[in-house]
């Protein structure tokens, strides 16, 4: 007889190799055929809603690692929620207006000057849709489950119509106004920028100290003094109309040779050192407030420079006397407005100085620095010129420096509802908790929101102008424009004349001749995506406002989190979200930012083509995503190793359940042995721990718990000793069926627990599980932890056994290294445990030699009775010897019972019995 044919070895069709790059696309096709998204919505219908609202990625180019991290995190949450009593619809979105698309078309050779705005916008829309399609396929390849056939896209007519309504609501409440104000202005984009569209980079600038002679001392000064200002933007000096001092600071009149200068007393030493003054003496001090309304002369123009009080003046740098140009700075503007100064801005859209800067007209602002500095030197006003490198705002798209420039713009007044914004921030749950402080400070400190852009590709600002210049925004015009956009899209604004965009028969007292013109500016793209709570959450039947969660990168505190909050609070008085979760950026393996120049860019597509989507997803679950995260080939290799371990665990479980029918073979919990029940306790602990981790969005805890369970609880312990019973005993042996019952519970629970993270693998495992009826594991719920009555006692006892077992394993390892034994089944062990451990061992009814995977086990005396040369460990001394007897051909155990049964002379007594009872006819 061939004894190896009597062993019940694992049998399964489930493949050992994942081959994910090939297998996943096939699985995704299967999902598409069975309409998995709709099936899940049907399955969870009627449950309470959980809405994770997708912040729309920008529709341009392939998805990068940041996109992958973001979408996969969202998918974890949505999948988990749909398996824990919620209906969790997920509608993906795209942000599709804005400058990058205009630039992409220009780069493709589109000659926009040769076509109408409407024609150019049509090309922009076509391009945007192509990009949406491209990104949609890449997101699907990640295994993200979403309503891919019905996404929201910001350029769609229904969306634009709702955005117009949001604008109209804000205007009606008095939150929208037009004003002349310095805004971030990008000469390279020729447009105003929002705070979210700027980034800081190092820039080399001139650093100059300039003297402004006093013209009128107002009886505080004698008139022969000079104010000293410091600036790094000499090009703004033609726009200087004043000097700001702090009311509470003390100022010194300093005599240097024959000159007298005015500076803040605190800065005397620094300025004296910088300007290399020798023998400088303070002749008088005055309070800043006393200098108010004194007048200085502009250094090279025949005009006054008014001295004003401003709280923005600091002693961090400079002289305490601040050059003030209301057309070129937020603080300057505020102070200038208070003192009735005009808003002078002698720089045009392209960043070129105009004829309001005589002597420098026609120069690009940056190129004007040198001639202006030379002019200052010529008139004797330049006290010092050096160059510094400092952090300076740049256009996030063109990467070029920006300027502050006063222009006529449309604004949303944040001031008008700042209090409500701050309250809304406090009512929201922030993860990480510092998110609250971050957004609170932004909302507290931010100025009014400049919402107009001088571009073509975007949603038009729905304002008309009467003949007398009055802006027209009424319920009637807003509703009419919204209806037109819903029917024709926003391009209708550029295709029709103003009168054809107004309601029929519309009249206005400011237009006696019935003539009107329309606004040509478009809205900031942050107003587009920031209106999604109205256009998507409020409009779609399957969603609701506020959403339960917004989840984006930490750059969105100043972006989408902020703009969504502003429009939602303005329109509804409440935040659009109950909770906000943010993640960090993806860096390379060394913690560097990814960039083309370094050549360290990791692309999701490459990972999916080489390793598979589930490996990328497993990586996402493994990192501390609330901070910046790292990725590299080495890191992915480690993750792939963990995946292999999880996959092999599934394969082992399936292989050993090939002949198991849960309805016929399952053993009742009460009839299981202690060690099997202990394994169920460990499984229930895992279920509890993993579900708690999912609940708190701690996916790394899920990853580690599952990995540890597979390697430590299963592989190193339970599955290791169970093989002896699973393979050797007869099919229906009670111990074998008991272990299979546990393995079955473990398999079903484990498959469900990994589903949110490894959906392809979980759905690949699912149909192989005996007795399952659901078409997909995604149509099931998370396992429930079953509390065993004696769970605590089992845990105490068997956790103690596991620590003692560790001591035994160490001893066996030493014996192997010293060539006392070959493998552990060659061993005979005698234990000399502590009193506590001895009592525990005596209470175990299971076969201890099976649990230790040795051929012979003996319990000696107490630990202090052990032979002197026996290695002592924390809980026991262990004597390891070669087991006596011969090796059984079937089970490999060393036994003195080999050949006792004459018919099976190469088998031990146990195997001979199993063979006779099960295989001999």
From Swiss-Prot:
Residue span of motif 'HIGH' region: 57-67
Keywords: Aminoacyl-tRNA synthetase, ATP-binding, Cytoplasm, Ligase, Metal-binding, Nucleotide-binding, Protein biosynthesis, Zinc
Main location: cytoplasm
Cofactor, how bound (note): Binds 1 zinc ion per subunit.
Sequence positions that bind L-isoleucyl-5'-AMP: 552
InterPro entries the record matches: aa-tRNA-synth_I_CS, aa-tRNA-synth_Ia, Anticodon_Ile_BEm, Ile-tRNA-ligase, Ile-tRNA-ligase_type1, Ile-tRNA_ligase, M/V/L/I-tRNA-synth_anticd-bd, Rossmann-like_a/b/a_fold
Self-association state and partner proteins as the record states: Monomer.
Similarity comment: family membership: Belongs to the class-I aminoacyl-tRNA synthetase family. IleS type 1 subfamily.
Protein name: Isoleucine--tRNA ligase 1
Origin species: Bacillus cereus (strain ATCC 14579 / DSM 31 / CCUG 7414 / JCM 2152 / NBRC 15305 / NCIMB 9373 / NCTC 2599 / NRRL B-3711)
């Amino acid at each position: 007889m061939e004894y190896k044919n009597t062993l019940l070895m694992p049998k399964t069709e489930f493949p050992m190799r994942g081959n994910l790059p090939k297998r996943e696309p096939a699985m995704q096709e299967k999902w598409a055929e069975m309409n998995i998204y709709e099936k899940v919505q049907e399955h969870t219908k009627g449950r309470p809603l959980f809405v994770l609202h997708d912040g729309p990625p920008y529709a341009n180019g392939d998805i990068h690692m940041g996109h992958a991290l973001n979408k996969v995190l969202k998918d974890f949450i949505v999948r988990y929620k749909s398996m824990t009593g919620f209906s969790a619809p997920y509608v993906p979105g795209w942000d599709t207006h804005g400058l990058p698309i205009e630039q992409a078309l220009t780069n493709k050779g589109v000659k926009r000057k040769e076509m109408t705005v409407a024609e150019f916008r049509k090309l922009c829309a076509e391009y945007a849709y192509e990009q949406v399609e491209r990104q949609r396929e890449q997101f699907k390849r990640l295994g993200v489950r979403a309503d891919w056939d019905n996404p929201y896209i910001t350029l769609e007519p229904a969306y634009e119509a709702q955005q117009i309504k949001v604008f109209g609501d804000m205007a009606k409440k008095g939150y929208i106004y037009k004003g002349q104000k310095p805004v971030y202005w990008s000469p390279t984009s020729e447009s105003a920028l929002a705070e979210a569209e700027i980034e800081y980079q190092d820039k080399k600038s001139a650093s100059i100290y300039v003297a402004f002679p006093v013209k009128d001392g107002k009886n505080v000064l004698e008139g022969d003094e000079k104010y000293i200002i410091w600036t790094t933007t000499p090009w703004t000096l033609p726009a200087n109309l004043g000097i700001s001092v702090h009311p509470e600071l003390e100022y010194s009149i300093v005599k240097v040779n024959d000159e007298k200068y005015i500076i803040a007393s605190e800065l005397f030493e620094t300025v004296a050192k910088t300007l290399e003054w020798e023998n400088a003496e303070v002749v008088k001090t005055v309070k800043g407030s006393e200098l108010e309304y004194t007048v200085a002369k502009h250094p090279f123009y025949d005009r006054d420079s008014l001295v004003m009080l401003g709280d923005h003046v600091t002693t961090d740098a400079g002289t305490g006397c601040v050059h003030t140009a209301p057309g070129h700075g937020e603080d300057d503007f505020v102070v200038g407005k208070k003192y009735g100064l005009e808003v002078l801005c002698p720089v045009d859209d392209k960043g070129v100085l105009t004829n309001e800067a005589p002597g420098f007209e026609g120069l690009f602002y940056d190129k004007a620095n040198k001639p202006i500095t030379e002019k200052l030197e010529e008139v004797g006003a330049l006290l010092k010129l050096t160059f510094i490198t400092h952090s300076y705002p740049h256009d996030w798209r063109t990467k070029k420096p920006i300027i502050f420039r006063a222009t006529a713009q449309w604004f949303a007044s944040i001031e008008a509802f700042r209090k409500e914004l701050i309250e809304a921030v406090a009512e929201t749950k922030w993860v990480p908790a510092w998110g609250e402080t971050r957004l609170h400070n932004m909302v507290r400190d931010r100025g009014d929101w400049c919402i107009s852009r001088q571009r073509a590709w975007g949603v038009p600002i729905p304002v008309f102008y009467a003949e007398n210049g009055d802006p027209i925004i009424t319920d009637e015009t807003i509703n009419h424009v919204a209806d037109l956009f819903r029917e024709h899209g926003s391009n209708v604004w550029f295709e029709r004349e103003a009168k054809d965009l107004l309601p029929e028969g519309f009249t206005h007292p400011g237009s006696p001749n019935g003539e009107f013109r329309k606004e040509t500016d478009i809205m900031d793209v942050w107003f587009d995506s920031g209106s999604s709570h109205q256009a998507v959450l409020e409009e779609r039947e399957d969603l609701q406002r506020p959403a339960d969660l917004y989840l984006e990168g930490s750059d969105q505190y100043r972006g989408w989190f902020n703009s969504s909050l502003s429009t939602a609070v303005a329109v509804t008085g409440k935040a659009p979200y109950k909770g906000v979760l943010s993640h960090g950026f993806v860096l390379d393996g060394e913690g560097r930012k990814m960039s083309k120049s370094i050549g360290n860019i990791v692309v999701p597509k490459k990972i999916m083509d080489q390793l598979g989507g589930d490996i990328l997803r497993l990586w996402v679950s493994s990192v501390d995503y609330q901070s910046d995260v790292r990725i590299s080939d080495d890191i992915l290799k480690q993750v792939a190793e963990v995946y292999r371990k999880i996959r092999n665990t599934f394969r082992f479980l399936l292989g050993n359940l090939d002949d198991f029918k849960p309805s016929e073979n399952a053993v009742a919990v009460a009839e299981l042995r202690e060690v099997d029940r202990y394994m169920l306790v460990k499984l229930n602990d895992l279920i509890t721990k993993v579900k708690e981790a999912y609940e708190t969005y701690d996916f790394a805890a899920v990853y580690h718990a599952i990995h540890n369970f597979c390697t430590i609880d299963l592989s190193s312990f339970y599955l290791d000793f169970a093989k002896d019973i699973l393979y050797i005993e007869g099919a229906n042996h009670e111990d074998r069926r008991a272990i299979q019952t546990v393995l079955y519970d473990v398999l079903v629970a484990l498959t469900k627990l990994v589903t949110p993270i490894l959906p392809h693998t979980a759905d690949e495992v699912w149909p192989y599980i005996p007795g399952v009826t659901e078409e997909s594991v995604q149509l099931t719920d998370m396992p429930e932890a079953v509390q065993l009555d004696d769970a605590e006692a089992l845990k105490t006892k068997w956790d103690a056994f596991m620590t003692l077992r560790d001591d035994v394993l160490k001893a066996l390892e030493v014996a192997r290294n010293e060539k006392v034994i070959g493998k552990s089944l060659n061993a005979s062990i005698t234990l000399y445990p502590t009193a506590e451990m001895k009592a525990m061992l005596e209470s175990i009814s299971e076969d201890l030699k099976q649990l230790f995977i040795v051929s012979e086990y003996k319990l000696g005396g107490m630990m202090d009775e052990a032979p002197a040369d026996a290695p002592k460990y924390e809980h026991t001394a262990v004597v390891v010897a070669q087991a006596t007897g011969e090796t059984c051909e079937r089970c490999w155990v060393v036994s003195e019972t080999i050949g006792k049964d004459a018919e099976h002379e190469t088998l031990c007594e146990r195997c001979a019995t199993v063979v006779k009872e099960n295989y001999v006819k």
